[in-house]
Amino acid sequence: MNVILLDKIANLGNLGDQVSVKAGYARNFLLPQGKAVVANAANTEVFEARRAELEAKLAAELATATERAEKLAALEAVVIASKAGDEGKLFGSIGNRDIADAVTAAGVELAKSEVRLPLGAIRATGEFEIDVQLHAEVKAVVKLSVVAED
């Protein structure tokens, strides 16, 4: 099925690209989320009329993400206190939501879906560098310090 992308989509294309995708991917994900429209003559004309508006929206989202990345870079280490054993092993773990809540409490709005923990949840005390994906083109790093609770 041929679709016109209304947003930048990783590993697929940019705004305005006409791409061929499997019908299920288009029907179940791209079309319902408003990330694409079916490629036909009428939709092509409508898209070309709205192209400037969509590009401005994407540029605004990128600017907002860049601004948030600068705020994250300016943050000192975010500290999370958690119950831990004698050898620094946590009772439980620290996941995406805990990190997002701590960063938000520190003054920069962050959603749990933006936090990237490729090795899974944190299960020990120490210093960590957490990757944050704010936008398809904007990444940031947050310094996280996990300390034992008294």
UniProtKB/Swiss-Prot annotation:
The keyword Ribosomal protein applies. Belongs to the bacterial ribosomal protein bL9 family. It comes from the Bacteria. The gene is rplI. GO terms for molecular function: rRNA binding; structural constituent of ribosome. Keywords: Ribonucleoprotein, Ribosomal protein, RNA-binding, rRNA-binding. InterPro entries: Ribosomal_bL9 (IPR000244), Ribosomal_bL9/RNase_H1_N (IPR009027), Ribosomal_bL9_bac/chp (IPR020594), Ribosomal_bL9_C (IPR020069), Ribosomal_bL9_C_sf (IPR036791), Ribosomal_bL9_N (IPR020070), Ribosomal_bL9_N_sf (IPR036935). This is Large ribosomal subunit protein bL9.
